[in-house]
């Protein structure tokens, strides 16, 4: 699909009355009669791609207000090991209408298993939009199916220099070793961390990654990062975080340090780490580590962004499912907030944009975005990808005098 297909998406008329329950001091400052409407951006019931399932949301809000949403196009169902491309949806009217485009195709080697998936995106200081994804052509789990570097695996990058109108051909980041520095010799494979990356105050691009390593005759997987100082031409890999079974993650910058919020399989809470040396070393970040429950059962991806409020307070927002029902249900995608300039307030719940149960075949993922006072979320909803504008909830914080 090389041309945009203009399709009008009608906003859902149903307002989810229980969508966002305001916690404590936010309630008095929010017009709760104006609950955010949902927009189905990627819909398994339309014929844009004739796909049976959409997963893995990534969201960017550009400087001019243009929104770019990304998703796996899972043609034959929710499965990870299947035939998958990556699609983008672009809106210039605050989500009322969307244009669609396939931005990364798989290698077309195997009609059942060729896939590119788990996109992670960033917008650089030059306005370039970079997307990184994992690529495979055979069946098997990315982290456990082999004991050495997988022969069918690569990490691919595409980019756009015109606000997502056109996209480059795929750039292989792993075949050419000059493009990736410091990749460990015991690597099984790696892929991006899912969601979005950041641009630091000095212009350095940082992308979260998850990496599988062969250690002591066993495979382990960890969270980490890669970073670029030349607008994505070459990348340097950081080291793994201290704990295995961490994987999908996102990072923010605070006073030159990197703070990570990570999936943490089997531990029932999200993990968090801080690095003062661009990922060469990591240590536990106590204000967030093991503070957000992810229920019993599987861990899950979550989003993590930093916002500077009008009063100068630096706020962190994290979205993740509570998973109160355990397993892979991943119900109640909730947005949490922490004030990095007043950690005594702890972590507070802002809202639950998706209070329903997730689809255990694949659900619970989300991606937050913030630009020019607008807070947005893209999330998985039973095989679709939905969007909500959470700006009213953000304004409830801005208007709260206790924050100042």
UniProtKB/Swiss-Prot annotation:
Originating species: Paraclostridium sordellii
Domain of life: Bacteria
Function, as annotated: Sialidases have been suggested to be pathogenic factors in microbial infections.
PROSITE patterns xref list: PROKAR_LIPOPROTEIN
Protein name per Swiss-Prot or TrEMBL: Sialidase
GO molecular function terms attached to this record: exo-alpha-sialidase activity
EC code(s) of this entry: 3.2.1.18
Signal peptide interval: 1-27
GO cellular component, one term: extracellular region
């Amino acid at each position: 699909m090389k041309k945009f297909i203009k399709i009008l998406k009608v906003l859902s008329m149903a307002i989810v009355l229980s969508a966002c329950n305001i916690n404590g001091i936010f309630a008095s400052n929010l017009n709760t009669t104006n609950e955010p409407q949902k927009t189905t951006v990627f819909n398994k019931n339309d014929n844009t791609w004739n796909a049976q399932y959409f997963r893995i949301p990534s969201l960017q809000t550009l400087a001019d207000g243009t929104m770019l949403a990304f998703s796996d196009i899972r043609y034959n169902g929710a499965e990870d090991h299947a035939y998958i491309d990556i699609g983008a949806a672009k809106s210039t009217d605050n989500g009322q209408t969307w244009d669609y485009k396939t931005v990364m195709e798989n290698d077309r080697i195997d009609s059942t298993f060729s896939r590119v998936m788990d996109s992670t995106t960033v917008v650089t200081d030059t306005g370039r939009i970079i997307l990184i994804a994992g690529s495979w052509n055979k069946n098997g789990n990315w982290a456990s199916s082999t004991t050495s570097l997988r022969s069918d695996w690569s990490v691919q990058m595409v980019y756009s220099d015109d606000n997502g109108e056109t996209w480059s051909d795929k750039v292989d980041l792993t075949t050419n070793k000059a493009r990736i520095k410091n990749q460990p010799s015991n690597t099984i494979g790696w892929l991006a961390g899912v969601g979005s990356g950041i641009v630091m105050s000095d212009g350095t691009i940082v992308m979260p990654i998850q990496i599988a390593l062969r250690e002591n005759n066993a495979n382990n997987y960890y969270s980490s990062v890669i970073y670029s100082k030349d607008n994505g031409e070459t990348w340097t890999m950081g080291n793994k975080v201290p704990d295995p079974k961490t994987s999908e993650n996102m990072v923010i910058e605070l006073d030159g340090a990197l703070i990570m919020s990570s999936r943490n399989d089997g531990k029932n809470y999200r993990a968090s780490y801080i690095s003062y040396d661009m990922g060469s070393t990591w240590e536990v970040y106590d204000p967030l580590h093991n503070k957000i429950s992810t229920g019993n059962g599987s861990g899950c991806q979550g989003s993590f962004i930093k916002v500077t409020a009008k009063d100068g307070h630096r706020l962190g927002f994290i979205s993740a499912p509570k998973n109160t029902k355990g397993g892979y249900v991943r119900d109640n995608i909730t947005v949490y907030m922490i004030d990095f300039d007043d950690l005594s307030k702890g972590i507070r719940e802002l809202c639950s944009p998706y209070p329903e149960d997730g689809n255990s075949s694949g659900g619970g993922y989300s991606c937050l975005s913030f630009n020019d006072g607008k807070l947005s979320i893209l999330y998985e909803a039973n095989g679709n990808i939905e969007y909500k504008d959470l700006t009213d909830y953000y304004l409830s914080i801005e208007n709260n005098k206790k924050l100042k």
